[in-house]
Curated annotation (Swiss-Prot):
Binding site for substrate: 10-12
Enzyme class label: hydrolase
EC number(s) recorded for this UniProt protein: 3.1.3.-
UniProt protein name: 6-phosphogluconate phosphatase
Length: 221
């Protein structure tokens, strides 16, 4: 690929340090329904997995049927509370975003209002004017590549000429299946390794400009 048309970012765990917060909110949600889970185990198992799928898995394992909309309300309220009090940016996110000269967007399995909340709190929204794309917009979520195609169409770019930066296996798979160059963020030692010709693994956002330059992509100032 000689020219990069756009850079796609995941949100949670890639730009905003929210994965542990979200795991704690899952634990709180299930506690409301009498199910006790270990926060670290939740973090390891469900990174990048959409909410209703997590509810289905845990419900099946515990032999219960949960009202998903009621459970979601508990979860969203707890996430909002924790975001307001504890949320921080991933180290290096601000510097990277300010250096990128190519068009950018965010592609997340989370709802748009969650992205608005987290990225607004961390002063990142101005990097992505009207460029927040959620699986909820099209009712299809990573690892399905549909979200990548949806975002590329809205951005008026060729998806195969775009980069995806994501910290989850599900996200990386969506990028692979869309034909993108995937930069797999593995700062978390719990991340499963991915070996694929379309995937480059890295451990800190500050590494990306040099990795891109090494590929001949001049997309940072």
């Amino acid at each position: 690929m000689s020219r990069i048309e756009a850079v796609f970012f995941d949100c949670d765990g890639t730009l905003v340090d929210s994965e542990v917060i979200c795991s704690r909110a899952y634990v709180t949600m299930f506690q409301e329904f009498g199910i006790t889970l270990d926060p670290e185990e939740v973090f390891k198992r469900f990174k990048g997995v959409k909410l209703y799928e997590i509810i289905d898995i845990v419900s099946l394992e515990h032999g219960v049927t949960l009202a998903k909309t009621e459970a979601e309300h508990v979860y969203r309220a707890e996430v909002a509370r924790l975001f307001d009090s504890e949320l921080e940016a991933i180290e290096g996110a601000g510097a990277l975003l300010s250096a990128i000269t190519a068009p950018m967007c965010v592609v997340s399995n989370g709802p748009n209002n969650k992205m608005q909340h987290s990225m607004g709190k961390l002063n990142m929204l101005h990097y992505f004017p009207d460029k927040l794309f959620s699986g909820y917009d099209i009712q299809r979520w990573k690892p399905d590549p549909a979200l990548m195609f949806h975002a590329a169409k809205a951005m008026n770019v060729n998806v195969e000429n775009c980069i995806l930066v994501d910290d989850s296996v599900a996200g990386a798979q969506s990028g692979i299946d869309a034909g993108m160059e995937v930069f797999y963020f593995c700062a978390d030692p719990h991340n499963k390794p991915i070996v694929h010709p379309k995937v480059t693994t890295f451990t800190h956002l500050s590494q990306l400009p040099e990795l891109w330059k090494a590929r001949g992509w001049d997309i940072t100032a």
